[in-house]
Every structure is written in C-alpha cells, then in structure tokens.
Amino acid sequence: MAMELFRVCLVVVTAIINHPLLFPRENATIPENEEEIIRKMQEHQEKLRLEQLRLEEEVSRLEAEKEALRQVEEEQQQLEAHTAWDLWTTLCMVLFLIIEVLRQNHQEGTFPECLGGDEDELSGLGGTLLQGLPLPNRATLDHFYEHCIRSTTGDATRTQEFVEGFVDDLLEALRSTYNGKTDMELEDFIGVGSMYENWQVERPLRCHLFIPFIPPEPYSFHPEFWCSSLSTPLERQGYGQIKVTLADGNPLGCVCGKAKLEEDMLCLLYGKNRGAWPSSAGCGEMEGLLCSRESSYLDVMQVMKWFQMALTRAWHRIAHKYEFDLAFGELDTPGSLKIKFRSGKSMPFILTPVIQCNDSDLYFILQLPKEPCGGGPASSAHWLLSFAVYEREFLRMTGKALPEGACHLSCLQIASFLLSKQTRLTGPSGLSDYHLKTALLHLLLSRQASDWKASKLDVRLQDLFCFLERSLLEKKLYHFFMGNHKVPEALGLPEVVRRAEPLNLFRPFVLQRTLYRNTVDSFYEMLKNAPALISEYSLHVPSVRASPPPKAVVS
C-alpha cells in the first residue's frame, strides 16, 4: 500500500515539474544569441590569427637577428684567424729572408771545408773528400805536366801567330769593300779564351777571336742588360738585347729604309714577321729583304747570316793568295771556321762577331737560341754577355802577384785534360772547361799568393776538385763576376754587373735531374780514372809532335 502511494506521488510531482507553464522554454531566443556568439567567435578567431602572424613575424625577426649575429661572429673569427695567418706568414717570410741573407753572406765569406785548412788539415780528412778517391802524387803530376802539357807551348804560339795573320788579311779584305752608309764597320780582333790565357790543352789547338762591329752613322747600338728589368725570367739572366737607335737615342727603323743595299746585304734588325715588304724607299728594290718595321732589336740569327756572308765575300777576294781552303766548322758554334790544308790536316778557329757594352770590356756575343727548361722557344733577340776579356785580365793581373812558376794554370790544365778524356770516354756531361775555370777564379780570390807555389800542385789540384765536388752536391756554382763584390775594383767592372744578382751556373741541374745524375757520375768516374790515365800518358809520351802550320804562299 505504501509502495503504491509512493508511486502516485512520484507521478504527480513529475507532471508538475514538466508542465510548460511552470518552467518557460529557455531556447526561445536561441536564434538571436547564436548569431552574436558566432560573430564574436569569428572576431576572436581573427584576433588569434593576427596574433599568430605577429608572433611568427617576431620569431622570424629574432631568428634573422640571431643568424646575423652568428654570421658576424663567424666573420670576426675568420678575420682574426686570417690576421693571425698573415702575421705568421709575414714573420716566416722575414725569417726566411734573414736566413737567406745570412747564407749568402756565409757563402761569400767562406768556401767548402776542404779549402779552409792547410795541407795537414786537408790530408787529415782523408777519405771524407772526393769519396775517398786518391789523386796522383806531386812527383807523378810534375812528370806528367812537363812531358805532356808544357812541351806543347811552342805549338800554341805558332798556331796563334798563323791564325792572327790570316784573320788580319781576312778583315782587311772586308774593309776594302766597306760602304760607310750601309755596312757594319768591323774593328780589330780581340783574342780570348784558353789559348790567350795560356792553359789550353785540348787538341787540335783552337784560337778564339772576338770581332767587334758597329753600325753605320747615324745609328748606334744601345745594350739593354737583363738586370734592368724586374720581370726577367731566370733563364734570361746573363743575357741582354741590342737596340738600334739614332745618334740622339731615338729608335728608328732599319738601315735599308734609308739607303740602297747590295743584293747580298741583310737587315739585321729583329722582328717577329719575316718576308718581303711592300715597295718603299730601298726595301722594294730587292726581294726577300729580311727587314721588320715592328722592332728595333738586333736578331742573333740575322747577324750570323750577315757575318757568314761577309766572311764568304772576303775569302773569295783573297783565296788566290793561299794554298788551302777555308770552310765553316761546327754548325752549333757561330763563327766556327776551319782551314783545310792540302796535306789533309786542318786548323780550326772561331771568329765571333760581338758588340761592345758602352766603354767597358763586356761584350754581347752570338749564341744560337736554345729551348729553355720548361719554356717555349728562346727569342733570337737575346745576346749572351761575355766576360772573356775580364777573365783574361784577371788571370794576368793575379799571375803577376803569384810566386814564380805558380801552379794555378797547371791545375786548370790538368783538370781540363782529365775532363776532355772523360768526355771522349762517356760522352759530354753538364761539366765544362768554363766551370773548371770559374772554380779556379774563386780559389784564386780566396787563397793567399803563397799557396800557389809550384811545390803545392797536388794540394791545389785537390782543392779544385773539392770545390767542384761541393758545388755539384749543392747544385750551386756562382758566376765569378756577376754580383761578386770581392772582385778587385782595378779591373774596372761596370757597377751594373757588380750590383746584379749572383748567377748560378749550375741552375740547370735543379731542373734536369737526369743531366745532374750523369754529371755527378761522370765527375767521380773521372777522378777514379785520373791516376791510371796520368800514369799511362806519362809513360807513353807521343814522340811525334804536331807540325807547325804551313806558311802562307803569296802568289
């Protein structure tokens, strides 16, 4: 009963609560409120979007500033590192420069260790020198020199007199056809080389004569040294160019443009393009005239052709006076000539056209263009600077201060003899007689006069070979005159040469390893063969000496 009453009450209460009049419907205004809410939500969403964009921009700006700051820091670090590197590089360069200067001073002031001591110190070094290869003793050297070298002095004198007389006649024939307006004027010859320095031992004897020539008026030669330009490559050191100028110093075109030339005259001016030029004042009157309007430098090849043609003309004028023939000799030696006698014997000699450098004893000489190491073909406008006259004068001046019968030339003659025999045995190497003479000149300047007594021939010969050995091992043999401040001022060497950078004659060995290896091997083999070779020639002295040259027959 109670349960039924409770159910009835629950139904009544539920009906009252759900009656619409008691609780009005709240969603009657939903349409207006919903639009407002949606609008506000959209506005809020727009604000959120704008805020998001602002935050994104702020983040991007902060990241950009951070990246810029990082780049600035990196650049600053790189700059600091670069500055530190430049500082270290500069310090290293300064240090290397100081070391090089000290090394140069040390090399100028001292010589290889085998040159510094006296005879006792030298003999005490024993096998450390020249790979322990022994040289002949003094008695053997004296005997060899007296019987194989000194005895040929008379032949050298007679040969020299004969060649000089013939060359005088040849030059006189050239001068007889001289045209003062177009021809080069040839001056008197100058004797140079081993024949005129009294140490030649190679057979057959060969005289070497310089023939200076000058251009016709109003032209002049203006030498240009290699050391006047900072951009001169190493292979051009020791060379120069010859510019043809007017008397007032202004460069001008070739002589053939101003005068009528003979058919066999060559224009000697250097130029890139060769061939026949259009007809103009003189040039158009002959075909194939080797003349250039683009440059005023003398060309080595053209001068050689001109000189050979001039010698040929001169010989044809005087050939009837002599009972021998004259022919050109070695093709790779400009001015090489050979007198051929009817008996079959011959007498070689060299006539080299040269150009004097101002008023000095320096001469620019012909040298055929060669392929430099690692470069293109050499220019034929470059002339080799020769110190031959200064070398002859230095040996003469030094010889006067040495004891009577000094052994300096004897050392050079024996060394030259050994080198020539080794060359015939194994072929040519990178070592020449000029290197031997350069080494001797350095020794003469470094040692006292008393060290060159005749009784010290064996010690001085060992000095010479020790010097060459050290130079070969270091690949450095400096030219005696270029940049050498120790050369006596009495020689009158031009200041431009004294101030020049030293020239390393062994520089090719740095680039040509095969040549260097062959030269070193040949040098030590020469020393190894020296005792046996000298003993052999001392025992078997030739009984038949070279006969003096036939006298000229004048018809």
From Swiss-Prot:
Family assignment from sequence similarity: Belongs to the ITPRIP family.
Subunit and interaction comment = Interacts with ITPR.
Biological function: Enhances Ca(2+)-mediated inhibition of inositol 1,4,5-triphosphate receptor (ITPR) Ca(2+) release.
Q: Where are the transmembrane segments?
A: 82-102
Sorted UniProt keywords = Cell membrane, Coiled coil, Glycoprotein, Membrane, Nucleus, Signal, Transmembrane, Transmembrane helix
**Glycan-carrying positions:** 27
- What is the protein's membrane topology class? Single-pass type I membrane protein
For this protein, the record's SMART domains field holds: Mab-21 (SM01265)
Q: What spans does the record annotate as topological domain Extracellular, numbered to this chain? A: 16-81
Example GO molecular function term?
protein kinase inhibitor activity
Q: Which residues form a coiled coil?
A: 32-84
* Taxonomic source organism: Mus musculus
Q: Where in the cell is it found?
A: Cell membrane; Nucleus outer membrane
Signal peptide span:
1-15
List the record's Gene Ontology CC terms alphabetically. nuclear outer membrane; plasma membrane
Membrane topology (Cytoplasmic): 103-555
Q: Which InterPro entries match?
A: ITPRIP-like, Mab-21_HhH/H2TH-like, MAB21L/cGLR
Which one GO biological process term can you cite for this protein? Answer: extrinsic apoptotic signaling pathway via death domain receptors
Protein name stated in the entry = Inositol 1,4,5-trisphosphate receptor-interacting protein
